[in-house]
């Protein structure tokens, strides 16, 4: 069967990385074509290298034949409906499978669901599915989870003499709690480094009341590859702003695979991703965060043990390629 993946697979950003990993996972099961939004992407060296490995063509939507048979998969493209791309996909005769990935709808998405343009909607979690229950009432739905190629995030022992904690997320001020810098600093750790990606002027304005000292490293989006950034951290300390609910937690699982121990808040999907005290820590209040972090800081053998267990849990329970392959074959079958 023919599968048309709409977007730009790569290693920058969650949706692009997911598409790249799905190509590796499914290239033997589907005749894949990548449909890029702009002609310049066809010449992108990284994309060309990925697609040439699997003999996959890249075209623009306007260059596809007027009549096609197969499935179109679009992932987290905020302009997919407002640009008219969804309607154009349908006029060519393709079944449209859509995965939003977020906890909010994009412009034109609700109208497309109501009109019947979407043949199947995918969700990464039950939590996300419940959020969109009204919008997608009557639309066939499937829960896929989120596939991360575990070989891209191999476990690595940390050897930096300076204890480093940090976080990785998109540069949205709402992703950060209002007390973010104080949250880190009041842990009371000595000889520590804080690394944050992604940071922006807009995020910085939210904390203009705080003076960031030399122990802070605030990186713009994609300043480093996600994997290399995570290798630089001992702990993935991830307090989240009160206005945000996580649909899944891709960066948390990437951190686990590398051996970066996650310390995360309750009330999201993280209890589905890790076992508290074994493959990470889920905290209800600041005192719990402080106790967990200080123990991991002071007890290196314990930290190394949890680091190993994080990676093993993520690889076996969350990122098993064959299990995900079966899931996606079902999700894309009509």
Which residues are covered by each model-predicted region?
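Extended catalytic core of nucleotide-activated donor transferases of GT-like folds
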Residues: 4-6, 24, 33-36, 41-119, ...
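A short, glycine/small-residue-rich beta-strand->loop->alpha-helix junction that serves as a flexible
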Residues: 6-20, 173-175
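Nucleotide-sugar-dependent
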Residues: 13, 175, 238-253, 265-272
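A charged, aromatic-enriched C-terminal amphipathic alpha-helix characteristic of glycosyltransferases
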Residues: 14, 284-287, 298-334
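Donor nucleotide-sugar binding/catalytic pocket of nucleotide-sugar-dependent glycosyltransferases
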Residues: 117-154
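Conserved catalytic-core segment of nucleotide-activated headgroup transferases in glycan assembly
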Residues: 149-224
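Conserved donor-binding/catalytic loop of nucleotide-activated donor transferases
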Residues: 231-233, 251-261, 265-266, 276
